[in-house]
Regions:
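Hydrophobic "lid"/C-terminal helical patch
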Residues: 80, 84, 275, 279, ...
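Flexible "cap/lid" subdomain of the alpha/beta-hydrolase fold that forms the substrate-access gate
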Residues: 9-11, 23, 36, 59-90, ...
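Hydrophobic residues on the short alpha-helix immediately C-terminal to a glycine-rich phosphate/catalytic loop
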Residues: 40, 107, 278-282
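Alpha/beta-hydrolase fold catalytic core
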Residues: 1-24, 46-49, 89-90, 253, ...
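Catalytic histidine-centered segment of alpha/beta-hydrolase-like enzymes
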Residues: 263-272
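Conserved HGGG/HGGXW glycine-rich cap/lid loop of the alpha/beta-hydrolase fold
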Residues: 14-63
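Conserved beta-strand scaffold positions in the cores of enzyme catalytic domains, especially
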Residues: 3, 51-53, 231, 258-260
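Residues at the C-termini of beta-strands that transition into short coil/loop
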Residues: 7, 17, 55, 122, ...
Length: 285
């Protein structure tokens, strides 16, 4: 399949590998697209797995609705459910990086029956992130999330500056060039920035307001992840710090692996062998 539809929107998807193989859904982050996984998928295909890597809402040219509500986490999760339905898959292994990681956590939380295994790259569980915003330096690291709430200004400022930002962040040159080129289109830039104007930023803000509440690890918390889960994190990630990374395990009530790499944020592009190895390790149990 090359595309699928949901609610009048058309999503592009890269469907590759053995058709009879178990399916792995790969969810990209900001400001990436399906090509973020291009160095990861060869190892998965060689292991007999089928991969489906969509260009998500805001990134597919046919799926760029306007308005904050169109980018709420419920919509983003339902887009992935629609992909599974279109591919006639009752379940799949799910892998997500950056914002795609946020969607992967939420999918496993809301629809565990559709997720065989979960591998999240870089992004901590959202409740761990909310806790870390109240402790340590995560709030400082996440200042840009508030700045990106401004209407239109971030798009206009970043259109000519994104390449330099991505280079300085450690993204490989070819990937930085490709992502920045797409961002020069105002529609593409607006679609990508709309992720920051929806959820889960409101949930994080709510976490800040609930400063005085504590969740006891002695009692199961609601919405814990119940599927086998691996979380990969780079200790040199400038945006996502250690407190949230280490606290993520509290929100997984199934087999859990935490893999710390001596790396930064762009793990699919910079550390594809490590990512594919951990995906395969999780898929194989």
């Amino acid at each position: 399949m090359h595309s699928y539809r949901r609610a009048g929107l058309t999503f592009d998807v890269q469907d590759a590998g053995p058709r009879e193989g178990e399916a792995v859904v790969l969810l990209h982050g900001w400001p990436q697209d399906h090509s973020a996984w291009s160095r990861v998928v060869p190892d998965l295909h060689a292991a007999g797995l089928r991969t489906l890597a969509p260009d998500q809402r805001g990134y597919s040219p046919g799926a760029r609705p306007r308005g904050r509500a169109a980018y709420g986490m419920g919509e983003l999760v339902d887009d992935v459910v629609a992909l599974l339905d279109a591919a006639e898959l009752s379940r799949a292994h799910v892998v997500g990086h950056d914002w795609g990681g946020s969607v992967a956590w939420a999918l496993a939380e809301r629809h565990p029956e559709r997720v065989r295994t979960l591998t999240v790259v870089s992004t901590p569980h959202h409740h761990a992130m909310a806790w870390a915003m109240r402790h340590g330096d995560q709030l400082r690291r996440s200042w840009y999330m508030a700045a990106f709430q401004l209407p239109l200004l971030p798009e206009l400022l970043l259109r000519g500056r994104l390449l330099g930002v991505l280079r300085r962040s450690g993204l490989p040159e070819a990937d930085a060039q490709r992502y920045a080129a797409r961002f020069r289109s105002l529609g593409a830039a607006r679609g990508a920035m709309s992720w920051y104007r929806g959820l889960p930023l409101g949930e994080l803000a709510g976490g800040l307001l609930r400063r005085g509440r504590r969740t006891s690890s002695a009692h199961p918390a609601p919405h814990r992840i119940t599927v086998p889960t691996t979380y990969l994190w780079g200790r040199r990630d400038p945006a996502l710090g250690r407190p949230a990374a280490e606290r993520t395990e509290r929100w997984v009530a199934s087999d859990y692996r935490f893999v710390e790499l001596d790396a930064g944020h762009w793990l699919p592009e910079r550390e594809p062998a490590a990512v594919s190895a951990e995906v395969l390790r999780r898929v194989r149990g």
